[in-house]
């Protein structure tokens, strides 16, 4: 795809990355076959190819509108399109760049900003989300029967083996997983324990940063990433063999740390180390 990026982004790190990605796209449309929003809505602009055109226009100097933002908002960032792209277009990174530019050019209404801020505050805070989840489950008897059936029932995580092996790995707790699916990490710990490996959760870890990254708060996301890189690298230096990811979304985000921190002289190399040692 031929590009002619505008001056405001041409010589920036994001501009160079975007241009490289855009030039790979050959307009074939294979991506639309695996895009859930395109399959549901049937609108070219709600598929990867259409969104790539929208992003290209904005990066070439066309002013973004609320409609542009809406089409990018509808993208789930599932990156399923990347699995069928013969040109290996890195759509996930491109849509992040596009969203950040569009967010600046087409500011959201106050209510939307408030709602997204509340989502970031709630979902990325494990203790706050856990408390709200417990309160919510207590209200189940007050709900209509059909809604009550949708309420997630509390689960017992089961036994988590005590650390007793020389070999050990660490695992990301996640933000909502300890409340909604607490059995997963405990089950992973039991499986690894039978293989002679102890699994541990570093206490200081925080959200992987996906919530902020995908709701256009990149600075907050990078702060979380740096904190986790510090924790992961310390654990690796102390003998941990790997960083285990039991949530695919968190795993995908951590695998992107090296790309997102590529321009940070203090964290670029350490983020690559975390990437090489991450197991999803």
Model-identified regions with their sequence ranges:
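Short cysteine clusters
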Residues: 25-31, 35, 75-81, 85, ...
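N-terminal glycine-rich anion-binding loops that anchor highly charged ligand groups
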Residues: 29-33, 43-48, 198-201
């Amino acid at each position: 795809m031929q590009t002619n990026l505008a001056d405001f982004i041409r010589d920036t790190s994001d501009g160079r990355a975007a241009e490289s990605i855009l030039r790979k796209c050959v307009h074939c449309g294979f991506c639309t076959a695996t895009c859930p929003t395109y399959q549901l809505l049937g609108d070219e602009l709600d598929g990867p190819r259409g969104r790539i055109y929208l992003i290209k226009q904005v990066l070439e100097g066309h002013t973004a509108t609320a409609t542009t933002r809406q089409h990018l908002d509808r993208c789930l960032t599932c990156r399923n399109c990347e699995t069928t792209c013969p040109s290996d277009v890195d759509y996930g990174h491109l849509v992040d760049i596009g969203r950040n530019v569009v967010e600046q050019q087409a500011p959201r209404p106050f209510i939307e900003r408030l709602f997204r801020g509340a989502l970031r505050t709630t979902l990325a805070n494990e203790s706050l989300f856990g408390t709200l989840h417990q309160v919510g489950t207590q209200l189940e008897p007050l709900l209509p029967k059909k809604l009550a059936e949708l309420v997630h029932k509390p689960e017992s995580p089961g036994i988590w083996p005590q650390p007793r092996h020389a070999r050990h790995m660490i695992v990301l707790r996640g933000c909502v997983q300890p409340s909604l699916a607490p059995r997963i990490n405990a089950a992973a710990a039991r499986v690894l324990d039978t293989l002679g490996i102890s699994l541990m959760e570093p206490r200081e870890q925080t959200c992987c940063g996906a919530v902020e990254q995908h709701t256009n708060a990149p600075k907050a996301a990078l702060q979380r990433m740096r904190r986790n890189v510090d924790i992961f690298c310390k654990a690796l230096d102390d003998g941990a063999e790997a960083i285990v990811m039991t949530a695919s979304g968190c795993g995908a985000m951590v695998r992107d740390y090296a790309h997102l921190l590529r321009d940070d002289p203090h964290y670029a190399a350490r983020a690559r180390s975390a990437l090489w040692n991450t197991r999803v």
